[in-house]
């Protein structure tokens, strides 16, 4: 999974959709399940 500051380019891919889970914004892809992204997580 990629951690991106902006999901603009990720959500424009074919077959991808934006999902909110537990307050975080994810991009998941049905056509290519290996492609996933999350918007900027905090580093511990």
UniProtKB/Swiss-Prot annotation:
Pfam family, one: Ribosomal_L36
Entry coiled-coil feature ranges: none
Xref: SUPFAM superfamilies: Ribosomal protein L36
One BP term from GO: translation
Regions that span the bilayer: none
Record keywords, A-Z: Ribonucleoprotein, Ribosomal protein
A GO MF label: structural constituent of ribosome
GO cellular component terms listed in the entry, alphabetical order: ribonucleoprotein complex; ribosome
InterPro entries, A to Z: Ribosomal_bL36 (IPR000473), Ribosomal_bL36_sp (IPR035977), Ribosomal_L36_bact (IPR047621)
Family as reported in the entry's similarity comment: Belongs to the bacterial ribosomal protein bL36 family.
Protein's recorded name: Large ribosomal subunit protein bL36
Organism this protein belongs to: Pseudoalteromonas translucida (strain TAC 125)
Lineage, opening ranks: Bacteria, Pseudomonadati, Pseudomonadota, Gammaproteobacteria, Alteromonadales
Name of the gene this protein is made from: rpmJ
